[in-house]
Amino acid sequence: MNAPQAPVLVADIGGTNARFALANPTLTSAPLLNDSLREFAVIEFPSLSEAAQHYLHHIGIHTTKGVFAIAGHVDGDEARITNHPWVITRTRTATMLGFDTLHLINDFVAQAMAISVLGPQDVIQIGSAKWEQVPLSAATRNYGIIGPGTGLGVGGLVIRNGRCYPLETEGGHVSFPPSTPEEIRILEILSQQFGRVSNERLISGPGLVNIHRALSEIDGIDPGPLRPQDITMRAADGDIRATRTINLFCNIFGAITGDLVLIQGAWDGVFLTGGLVPKLLNSIQHSGFRQKFEHKGRFSAIMARIPSLAVIHPHPGLLGAAAYARDTEPVPQDIKA
């Protein structure tokens, strides 16, 4: 039997925080090693390599392999973090850390890969359609993933013969398709500001503000400057316009999530992730999300059978980075079939 495989350093790097953990890529569930998770403010370090070195020194373990999920554009050897000045070069970072292998992936690629290791305890079902935990041995599985946060991430995961292939897209920038007179009026108002209006202009944190502003204009009200959290707090306090905003957000979210299933052929389910989903989970569950998701004309009966699931695992980016490491590693001889 071969010696135990060395852990892989996985990271989820955002504009504010850098999260690190160690992972065993041979595990198909719970790949993150116990008590290895640490979180640091990116402002504390001049570079990603120094943050990673600090983590490895702090935890007292050396490794030579890493997968870093980056909240920003990854272009070959280089990655730029959105909302932070770090510019990450893969080869230089690997050299600084003494790594033999380092992968830089987009954070939403990591979110998609996380689907393959999520368990029933990591998701909440939205609607009545049932979901079974992803069987990696399945010959064919197609999943969608969509996540509103600062922007709107859209992607997918294709499983073929136990191998996972993430789909990296810019689906959040698809044009917004209104389906009611109210939504048409909102589109007209937002078009005056943005010209072309994408789904991200509505289904995101800033999108909440845009919807509220448009509804206020329809009502002839000046709401003043608001943040997304102001709207959710007002809705919790019973404010009528804020509540309308949340309900409309959830309805549109459901409609475009259903569109994602049709476009990608994600017949095995779609996962909701991103920073807004946990905060709006109760609203999503009790809104028209699922009705709009299923309301697809001649495909409505098929859509009713497709599960939609909110991801509640606190660190899906790290899970996904670990899953990515698994699918970039050769299968050890002692566990081959």
Swiss-Prot record:
Pfam families: Glucokinase. It comes from the Bacteria. Its main location: cytoplasm. ATP binds at residues 11-16. Keywords: ATP-binding, Cytoplasm, Glycolysis, Kinase, Nucleotide-binding, Transferase. CDD domains: ASKHA_NBD_GLK (cd24008). It catalyses: D-glucose + ATP = D-glucose 6-phosphate + ADP + H(+). Disulfide bonds: none annotated. It is an enzyme of class 2 (transferase). It is found in: Cytoplasm. One of its GO terms (biological process) is glycolytic process. GO terms for cellular component: cytosol. One of its GO terms (molecular function) is ATP binding. InterPro entries: ATPase_NBD, Bacterial_glucokinase, Glucokinase. Its EC number is 2.7.1.2. HAMAP family: Glucokinase. Belongs to the bacterial glucokinase family. This is Glucokinase.
